[in-house]
Amino acid sequence: MPHFTVVPVDGPRRGDYDNLEGLSWVDYGERAEREDPDGHGNHRESSPFLCPLEASRGSDYYDRNLALFEEELDIRPKVSSLLGKLVSYTNLTQGAKEHEEAESGEGTRRRAAKAPSMGTLMGVYLPCLQNIFGVILFLRLTWMVGTAGVLQALLIVLICCCCTLLTAISMSAIATNGVVPAGGSYFMISRSLGPEFGGAVGLCFYLGTTFAAAMYILGAIEILLTYIAPPAAIFYPSGTHDTSNATLNNMRVYGTVFLSFMTLVVFVGVKYVNKFASLFLACVIISILSIYAGGIKSMFDPPVFPVCMLGNRTLSRDQFDICAKTTMVDNETVATRLWSFFCHSPNLTTDSCDPYFLLNNVTEIPGIPGAAAGVLQENLWSAYLEKGEVVEKRGLPSTDAVGLKENLPLYVVADIATSFTVLVGIFFPSVTGIMAGSNRSGDLRDAQKSIPVGTILAIVTTSLVYFSSVVLFGACIEGVVLRDKYGDGVSRNLVVGTLAWPSPWVIVVGSFFSTCGAGLQSLTGAPRLLQAIAKDNIIPFLRVFGHGKANGEPTWALLLTALIAELGILIASLDMVAPILSMFFLMCYLFVNLACAVQTLLRTPNWRPRFKYYHWALSFLGMSLCLALMFVSSWYYALVAMLIAGMIYKYIEYQGAEKEWGDGIRGLSLSAARYALLRLEEGPPHTKNWRPQLLVLLKLDEDLHVKYPRLLTFASQLKAGKGLTIVGSVIQGSFLESYGEAQAAEQTIKNMMKIEKVKGFCQVVVASKVREGLAHLIQSCGLGGMRHNSVVLGWPYGWRQSEDPRAWKTFIDTVRCTTAAHLALLVPKNIAFYPSNHERYLEGHIDVWWIVHDGGMLMLLPFLLRQHKVWRKCRMRIFTVAQMDDNSIQMKKDLAVFLYHLRLEAEVEVVEMHNSDISAYTYERTLMMEQRSQMLRQMRLTKTEREREAQLVKDRHSALRLESLYSDEEDEAAAGADKIQMTWTRDKYMTEPWDPSHTPDNFRELVHIKPDQSNVRRMHTAVKLNEVIVTRSHDARLVLLNMPGPPKNSEGDENYMEFLEVLTEGLERVLLVRGGGREVITIYS
């Protein structure tokens, strides 16, 4: 499945957030600056909703079915138009795009990207196999089995494979938590842990990959000079003690030549490396199959590789041909070359012979007894050796004697001191390479599926091969041959090759080409990793390595990689380079596990991996295992690697990397104090870190009791976002006089918060007007980065029955304030019917009606609610609306793909709303609304007596300073005969008798009023949408719905309230949602 990014919709680019997340950033400031010709934003039909500029943009804005949302369709686009632009793939990381734009000046250059087409097998499984199987399997596994014994060798393999398996589980969780663009492992680590950790670990990963190239080259040289062409050696030992020096010098010279040639190949074109990758992989697979074939054959026909023993000591067979002290030539006993070596004379004299040679017999034993010979029992136990110690076979008769030191090269001796920890460090590189699949994330058709399946299958496959190989080697090969690292005792044959069928050359040639191929792959991957780090510009002095050839090949990074690899070549010992490699990879794997554990424990809203088989305890175990392996294998290397990583971390921190990648470490700042608050001041949170920080505006009754406690219940059920919760209320009056009431109200709210298990803060303000107090709360609540980004506002019940317009004016003014402050708004309607924390919905649906795109709040809120036990069993359904010209089938497919990448499980349904004529009911409903509004307006203008009476009522109630949240004086309406009949219909108008002499002229005009056409269209939208929603969602546990924006001028406020009432009529529980002008959910990891 392709990767998706959402492109900006009809608007200019506004910085990095648009580039990264792809969705248009709503700038209300710019909207405010676009004034209309009449100065009031009025439509030519005197509509308070639609301005002439928008009306001229085409039929989209005159769509009858969406007329209620038409004012903001330019910044909150229809879902149908948004889904049509989803499928726009890019395989560039954010840093790469920034770097590319910086180089091109205007930032307009874009490369055409091929559609990713690789599946799990070719894209992840086989590359991982090729990278995991390598030089250690062919050159060191037999030696490890002979030295550690089968049991301890199995333990080493188990520990190392468990480490990589746990890391792969963590990596799978991170990789499936959104689209991973090209950049693979480094991208995942850096975007999960932040620029400091990301840069440190990225460089460690780079150094590990670079030293891997050196290790593979050294392995190829060892195979070449030891088994393929020994005469090609340039340096030869000048004495008995110069053997190792000559070997190391040969490795350095040939290693440098090989490295130069491979660097040239990579420089000329990486396409040649990719072409030969399949050939190299075939070599690996054929070599492994030949080992198994040889093991099976050895059960009934073991190969002939005799080993010459002097007493119980193993002799180096490459220096003599006959395994005997004497031989018969022409019926005459003559000394063999072996006698000449130990006695320093061709004569059969014993004067100068080695004492051990004289006292012990020379015997010949089979090097490959076969699986049926029972050597497994002998090879179960360890036989660790010190450097220079002779390889001996337990059980053979031997007479101890002090041998001559100069004869030591005639024996097979240990070249290094061995122990369990040393073998762990040497073997661990043979299980690395698990990142090969994630490194190709940009080429995968469905990375979220392929990376976990392919990587874990590759680890399971290689682990089974390693386990079976350990048992096979222990069961088929003689112990002294296993401990013979270079095959000196079997005539300088590759030990694993002696077991292979049909010929040892299959393994020798196959391993040579596979190690060369692995070296080329490392030299190809490491420069690209360095280039990605350099393009992110988190380490300034590395920026030069972000540049390359015209086609993007990292020339300078390749040069630096070759220089660092040369340092590994100069070490010249495979056994010395392998632990260095282990340190850097273990460091990388440690931080992958740390990233997964941090994200899981923080439970950020964006942490929604499709891979479900992870747990923070597994990640923590993997992290602990990586740390333990680092110190077990080589504690001083571990300290050096950690010191390097620490220095890089502090350097990046000192330089002040101005990067915000939505990393998990920033999430920890929410639980810290001053230091965290200062860091949170640096800028707005990344979309991946966005969580609802709620400001809940409560209404108190006259006794200072919370009027709607279910608002707090609802806030507590959103606590899965792990965000901030502030509960606010307003006391009307003077602060000096009402301070005590404010304190009492605050205590009441805190008690209710405790009952409803809301963890947060309470703030009560005193203001002369309630709407001013609400504006103060919206502006000033919070501290630094700990500020609210969402407002929970109750619905103004009874607004129709109140003759005072302030009953709904305060509500609409608060909506406008949240919009101006770029805050999200949640309006739960019928809050009394919302469930308490003790209820459980065992079934049912949470329905989302996604009509216009508003930043993704509609998708995120149900996900957070379903984390709570009340809503956990509910299923999520997403409905969107298709018009006549929309392809509803394609919309459904696109929406399903989009939700797949958002990692949200939901049923998708596209509801077709065809353009229909405006019904008589809609016309009548609009007429009723406008008559009522006009009547109230005329009464307020002409009935001075009623105004005077209302003023008296207000004066009588001025002592009550506690005021409603949504109206300044909602309950001050006078009772009695003067009360106005608010429900005004044409029928009532016709049936009630009236006297024209007592009716103002303006009131006589009400019967002749014609409804405004824009209002008719909006009412049509509300009625049609309500019909569809009630039909589909009448049994839903909760309905989430886009909240239309308020009118631009205040004359349409009452009509706006009526539209909202009609839109939500007949629904038991409704949550009206209005985004804050920024994205809150993303497909990226």
Swiss-Prot record:
The Gene Ontology terms for molecular function here are: ATP binding; metal ion binding; potassium:chloride symporter activity
Phosphoserine (modified residue): where?
Answer: 24, 47, 59, 81, 88, 734, 916, 967, 1050
Q: Which UniProt keywords apply?
A: ATP-binding, Cell membrane, Chloride, Disulfide bond, Glycoprotein, Ion transport, Membrane, Metal-binding, Nucleotide-binding, Phosphoprotein, Potassium, Potassium transport, Symport, Transmembrane, Transmembrane helix, Transport
Q: Which Pfam families match?
A: AA_permease, SLC12
Binding-site residues, chloride 1:
433-435, 589
How would you describe this protein's topology in the membrane? Multi-pass membrane protein
Query: Which residues does chloride 2 bind?
Result: 589
InterPro entries to which the protein is assigned, alphabetical: AA-permease/SLC12A_dom, KCC1, KCL_cotranspt, SLC12_C, SLC12A_fam
Has the keyword Nucleotidyltransferase been applied to this entry? no
Return the annotated region ranges for Scissor helix.
665-681
* Regulation (activators, inhibitors): Inhibited by WNK3.
Q: Which residues bind K(+)?
A: 131-132, 216, 429, 432
Q: Which residues lie on this side of the membrane: Cytoplasmic?
A: 1-119, 173-196, 441-450, 532-554, 599-612, 652-1085
Q: Span of the secretion signal?
A: none
Q: Which residue spans traverse the membrane?
A: 120-141, 150-172, 197-225, 249-271, 272-297, 420-440, 451-473, 505-531, 555-575, 576-598, 613-635, 636-651
Residues annotated as glycosylated: 245, 312, 331, 347
UniProt PTM: N-glycosylated. Phosphorylated, phosphorylation may regulate transporter activity.
Gene Ontology annotations of biological process type? cell volume homeostasis; chemical synaptic transmission; chloride ion homeostasis; potassium ion homeostasis; potassium ion import across plasma membrane; potassium ion transmembrane transport
Q: Name one GO cellular component term.
A: synapse
Principal place where this protein is found? membrane
Which annotated residues bind ATP?
697, 699, 707-708, 730, 794-795, 797
Protein role: Mediates electroneutral potassium-chloride cotransport when activated by cell swelling. May contribute to cell volume homeostasis in single cells. May be involved in the regulation of basolateral Cl(-) exit in NaCl absorbing epithelia.
| Family matches, as NCBIfam families | 2a30 (TIGR00930)
Which family is this sequence assigned to? Belongs to the SLC12A transporter family. K/Cl co-transporter subfamily.
In Swiss-Prot or TrEMBL terms, this protein is called Solute carrier family 12 member 4
Q: Which organism is it from?
A: Oryctolagus cuniculus
Q: Which gene encodes it?
A: SLC12A4
